[in-house]
């Protein structure tokens, strides 16, 4: 395996709860109104220090999307997913953006969203936007 290069973020950021690797800046939050199977999730315009899994079509609360799960590049922990393609016209704004599950990341003030509220049947991507 080659040398691992990490992007260091300047400013308030969200990081992996397992290894504290920077994942996204607070300034890159698009929406805090998303829901995942474990509870709250935030939509970000830019996420760093992650690698993507296999593309798959997934039916979510807002319709069919092509997504990839994303993992921390340092420790390999699942942290959320990235939207590759939205089938519905009104969901196109999500393309290229990533969702981080709050219970999988540390917040900018060092807190973690520990409450895992189970949501029925698969992934959710409800938002108020």
UniProtKB/Swiss-Prot annotation:
Keywords, ordered alphabetically: Metal-binding, Zinc
InterPro entries to which the protein is assigned, alphabetical: Yippee, Yippee/Mis18/Cereblon, Yippee_fam
Organism of this sequence: Arabidopsis thaliana
Name this polypeptide is given: Protein yippee-like At3g11230
One term of GO molecular function: metal ion binding
Family: Belongs to the yippee family.
Record carries keyword Zinc: yes
Domain spans labelled Yippee: 12-109
Any Pfam family: Yippee-Mis18
């Amino acid at each position: 395996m080659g040398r691992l290069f990490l992007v260091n973020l300047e400013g308030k950021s969200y990081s992996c709860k397992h290894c504290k690797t920077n994942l996204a800046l607070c300034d890159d939050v698009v929406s805090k109104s998303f829901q995942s199977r474990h509870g709250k999730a935030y939509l970000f315009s830019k996420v760093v220090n992650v690698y993507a899994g296999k593309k798959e079509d997934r039916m979510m609360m807002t319709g069919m999307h092509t997504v990839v799960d994303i993992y921390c590049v340092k420790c390999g922990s699942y942290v959320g997913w990235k939207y590759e393609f939205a089938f519905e016209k009104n969901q196109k704004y999500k393309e290229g953006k990533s969702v981080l599950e709050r219970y999988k990341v540390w917040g900018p003030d060092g807190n973690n969203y520990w409450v895992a509220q189970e949501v029925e049947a698969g992934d959710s991507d409800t938002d108020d936007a």
